[in-house]
Amino acid sequence: MAVGRPKRVMIVAGEASGDIYGAGLVRAVQAADPAFSFFGIGGPRMREAGCETLVDSADMAVVGLVEVLKHFDVIAAAFLKLKKILLEDPPDLLILIDYPGFNLRLGKVAKKAGVKVLYYISPQIWAWRQGRVKKIKRLVDHMAVILPFEVPFYEQAGVPVSFVGHPMADLVEVSLTRDQAATSFGLDTSRQIVGLFPGSRRSEVSRLLPTILEAARLLQQCLPGLQFVLPLASTLSDDDLAPWLEGCELPITVTRDRIHDLMRACDAVISVSGTVTLEIALVGTPLVIIYKLSPLTFQLAKRLVKVEHIGLCNIVAGETVARELIQEEASPEQIAGEIGRLLRDAEYNTAFRERLTHVRERLGGGGADRRMAGLVLSMVEQS
């Protein structure tokens, strides 16, 4: 393909983490070749990077069968919008970021339209629904994975695959000390700080924030001097938290800025499962991982999931770095008990922090955005 010719790339990131990774990729590609333009599904970070978002990822970020059914109309409309573009005005490349239920269907449309498909960040099919690898082999031209053990999985299935490294290895770099970070948020460095991380999806917040807040109340009863911080994800608004925070008497600082500095300011964190657990681990802050699904979704998942851990920091480390409390175990009492131990048991805390160092060791070096940009340029040039 001639150098300098405008090159259009459709990119689909249906969740907050994908918005972060997509933004880094867009910047890296445009730095290498300004002739590239991006459009598709994303959030504020991708828009800031220069991507035209036809659909906001905040409207797509749901988990579980019941939750998807509730948002079916929005998701279906987004799919039809992108399908129409793929068939009537096909781009030079389609980049899919995780979000497999939606993205694999879109990949099928791209194949019909003759558009090459680059899949960035593998669905966790090694954990469940391994049969999906056959569909991926049919629909995806190249798989770019971020965890080393994913490479042999795809190689054995005959899927072209590259290990590009985990983008978080570059994104999570904090130079501040705990006290410096705490001071920057106006917090009292002499008092312990607990992070309350309810997730980036509205459905997660409504399902888990009440439990997290009740755990915080129990902690405050035992440790009256505690301070709490709560990050507001880019996919959420103040209104999404209002039903639970209005009238809440806990000393909670809500912020949208400098998430990694906020993690460093914390002495311990209550976090939902997801990419955020990896970020917290890379910062080096002890945490407890919680998750709840609707009863129907959980029963289905229990039959299908084939891995020991749900927390990404534990999956990457290959061991139980952070305790996981799932469904009924994710009670305010158990959550408060684990955080209380992290705050009061110095020996337990030290051993925990030592395990956290294993996570960064397993991720290896950075450079994921640069490697991904190289793949994008190569695939477009060959198309």
UniProtKB/Swiss-Prot annotation:
A GO-annotated cellular component: membrane
Gene Ontology molecular function: any one: lipid-A-disaccharide synthase activity
Stored Pfam families: LpxB
InterPro entries: Glyco_trans_19 (IPR003835)
Record keywords: Glycosyltransferase, Lipid A biosynthesis, Lipid biosynthesis, Lipid metabolism, Transferase
Enzyme Commission number, as recorded: 2.4.1.182
Catalytic activity annotation: a lipid X + a UDP-2-N,3-O-bis[(3R)-3-hydroxyacyl]-alpha-D-glucosamine = a lipid A disaccharide + UDP + H(+)
Superkingdom of source: Bacteria
Enzyme class: transferase
Keyword flag Lipid metabolism: yes
Pathway: Bacterial outer membrane biogenesis; LPS lipid A biosynthesis
Swiss-Prot/TrEMBL GO biological process terms: lipid A biosynthetic process
Keyword field contains Glycosyltransferase: yes
Functional summary from the UniProt entry: Condensation of UDP-2,3-diacylglucosamine and 2,3-diacylglucosamine-1-phosphate to form lipid A disaccharide, a precursor of lipid A, a phosphorylated glycolipid that anchors the lipopolysaccharide to the outer membrane of the cell.
Family from the record: Belongs to the LpxB family.
Protein name (database record): Lipid-A-disaccharide synthase
Organism: Trichlorobacter lovleyi (strain ATCC BAA-1151 / DSM 17278 / SZ) (Geobacter lovleyi)
Biological classification of the source: Bacteria, Pseudomonadati, Thermodesulfobacteriota, Desulfuromonadia, Geobacterales
Gene responsible for this protein: lpxB
